[in-house]
Amino acid sequence: MIYQGETLSVRYLDDGIAELNLNAPGAVNKFDLKTLECLNEALNALYQQSDLKGLLITSDKDAFIVGADITEFLGLFAKPAEELSQWLTRANDIFNKLEDLPVPTLSAINGHALGGGCECVLATDFRLADITARIGLPETRLGIMPGFGGTVRLPRLLGADSAMEIITAGKDKKAQDALKLGLVDAVVAPTALKDAALSMIKDAIAGKLDWQKRRAQKKAPLTLNKIEATMSFTMAKAMVAQVAGKHYPAPMTAVIAIEAAARMSRDEALVVENKHFITLAKTDVAQSLVGIFLNDQYIKGKAKKAAKEGQPTKKGVVLGAGIMGGGIAYQSALKGVPVLMKDIAVPSLDLGMAEAAKLLNKQLERGRIDGVKMAKVLSGITPSLHYAGAEDADIVVEAVVENPKIKAAVLAEVESNVSDTTVIASNTSTIPINLLAQSLKRPENFCGMHFFNPVHRMPLVEIIRGEHTSEETISRVVAYAAKMGKSPIVVNDCPGFFVNRVLFPYFAGFSLLLRDGADFTQVDKVMEKQFGWPMGPAYLLDVVGIDTAHHAQAVMAEGFPDRMGKNYKDAVDVMFEQQRFGQKNGNGFFAYSVDRRGKPKKNVDPAVAELLAPVLGAATDFTSDEIIARMMIPMINEVVRCLEECIIATPAEADMALVYGLGFPPFRGGVFRYIDTLGLAEYVAMADKFAHLGAVYEVPTGLREKAAKGESYYTQQVNA
């Protein structure tokens, strides 16, 4: 044994060939601070070996290295820039030490080699992958860029264009694609990886493979003439500007760093990478995107825990076919849980099966599934007019029409047709779970399961706990939602649950702006282009459906009359009266036509201004900051109230529900990350300026107290 550390070891195999084996405690290998130090110590030991002829790097895990330990990021990013620079320099000194070993080096890659894992294999002379390998640099998706030499070595290995595509997209490459690009030298079967790696390193030792030429290429400037460089970097910047936009600076910064270092040697180029990495690490965007990653891991961790605690779902029932029921049935069957889809009408069952078939055909066309998988999924959905077969179901998801009396009747009926241990969940967006539970004999087996439309695309599922819901029920439904590929977030029962409860104060802010003379097209433009929502409020209302929103607003007003009741007629009322229901019937705040791909196309409708004139104030030119403040303060206040009232358990879950359920701009991180970034005292001062507008603008007491104490909602990281 040459070296034995906590996360890796080095030993001789035969004839002067050493193996550096990555085998950290836990499920995966990460390039955390500890592993970097172990690598440094291992390399120091290797430099002392006079008999060393070659080095293989291997992994004992299913994945080579999944990347850096992102839980360390926020702590590192909070350090002074000089200290962060020193850490990066030290890390790169270690990778340079690997690259500069006086013998040929080879990485034998199995599974994922991402981020720091990819940068590690780039530092070796050769890369051999098995067919399961996926290699990439996802850092730009976290608001940063590669910092362990990725922007230096990858362009010198692949050429600037291919390297910039990989780095700016942040997506990994399958083994065969990596081979075509030249990112790996060969791809073999998993069982052949070790022997093939030994054979290749022996060829390098024997001089059959020129490892020194390979190494020299990675340490030299890029081989681009001035005209080629100008064309390459100009096109890359134009593409990145179009795709990433102004709110996500990391991809553009990576391109700028590669361009600035193009004519430099490795060591000079690493200094450039260091500087640009630090610039990004200090941005609010990086804090937000890293925070989202950590929050997502926290939610996944809770779902895994629930899966261990609750019995697995082997069979489900969906009550109510149609688009929503068909979508739920499809998602369940796709992920391996067969379902009985029950309805009272054959046309509805046909519609549900057609919805599932349509979604599967899209997957087939895109090459994501084959015909065998499609047939298997469809055979996993059994349409039925009867309850026969439901008696052994683990979970029932009721998805009938959004009417409390109908739902209550259906729930009582299904309860009498299933076992005493079957969990029943209602897919409802507005009806209180405690109200529906009154129709059941076993309310402890009942909860809400609010899917978002379209089911196959929207990641969030709200799991609603009623007064009598057992923890066993919650665990089983959370585990089922996770099995379906969703992000389940548990909330307590209240009008609108969490997502709709916080959405309608936002719509109230919109109505008040219009009442005070704002132009709804300007409001939409500001909230999309400046704040970063995928849709402005008018467009969102059209997509949700004006009739749906009008009904939900009445429910919210009944539940929270002080804040959400209104004593004036607003723009949504006018749209509803005029039966302009939005995209569903072609007219709402905007008019809709069908584009060449069959998708709704939004158009300005001149008739709307005249229709709204009676409820609009005198035209007023609001600044972008005023529009953002007046739109966001009501939502922020309601989100905080939900936390204070224990409707939602943590800031992390609240922020992820907003990002996954409403499309809250990821670069802002969610409401709690956003107000932490603003500063709670600054937020309170801003909100107080608008307090005269009504109760939705009044800052919750708990938030005001935290602001006075100088506190924030997040510490540096969320622990799963």
From Swiss-Prot:
The active site is at residue 450. Residues 1-189 are annotated as: Enoyl-CoA hydratase/isomerase. Pfam families: 3HCDH, 3HCDH_N, ECH_1. Substrate binds at residues 296, 500, 660. Coiled coil: none annotated. Pathway: Lipid metabolism; fatty acid beta-oxidation. One of its GO terms (biological process) is fatty acid beta-oxidation. GO terms for cellular component: fatty acid beta-oxidation multienzyme complex. Keywords: Fatty acid metabolism, Isomerase, Lipid degradation, Lipid metabolism, Lyase, Multifunctional enzyme, NAD, Oxidoreductase. Its EC number is 4.2.1.17, 5.1.2.3, 5.3.3.8, 1.1.1.35. Residues 311-720 are annotated as: 3-hydroxyacyl-CoA dehydrogenase. Gene3D superfamilies: 1.10.1040.50, 2-enoyl-CoA Hydratase, Chain A, domain 1, NAD(P)-binding Rossmann-like Domain. It catalyses: a (3S)-3-hydroxyacyl-CoA + NAD(+) = a 3-oxoacyl-CoA + NADH + H(+); a (3S)-3-hydroxyacyl-CoA = a (2E)-enoyl-CoA + H2O; a 4-saturated-(3S)-3-hydroxyacyl-CoA = a (3E)-enoyl-CoA + H2O; (3S)-3-hydroxybutanoyl-CoA = (3R)-3-hydroxybutanoyl-CoA. InterPro entries: 3-OHacyl-CoA_DH_CS, 3-OHacyl-CoA_DH_NAD-bd, 3HC_DH_C, 6-PGluconate_DH-like_C_sf, ClpP/crotonase-like_dom_sf, Enoyl-CoA_hyd/isom_CS, Enoyl-CoA_hydra/iso, FA_oxidation_alpha_subunit. NAD(+) binds at residues 324, 343, 400-402, 407, 429, 453. The record marks 119, 139 as: Important for catalytic activity. GO terms for molecular function: 3-hydroxybutyryl-CoA epimerase activity; delta(3)-delta(2)-enoyl-CoA isomerase activity; enoyl-CoA hydratase activity; long-chain-3-hydroxyacyl-CoA dehydrogenase activity; NAD+ binding. In the N-terminal section; belongs to the enoyl-CoA hydratase/isomerase family. Heterotetramer of two alpha chains (FadB) and two beta chains (FadA). Involved in the aerobic and anaerobic degradation of long-chain fatty acids via beta-oxidation cycle. Catalyzes the formation of 3-oxoacyl-CoA from enoyl-CoA via L-3-hydroxyacyl-CoA. It can also use D-3-hydroxyacyl-CoA and cis-3-enoyl-CoA as substrate. This is Fatty acid oxidation complex subunit alpha. It comes from Photobacterium profundum (strain SS9). The gene is fadB.
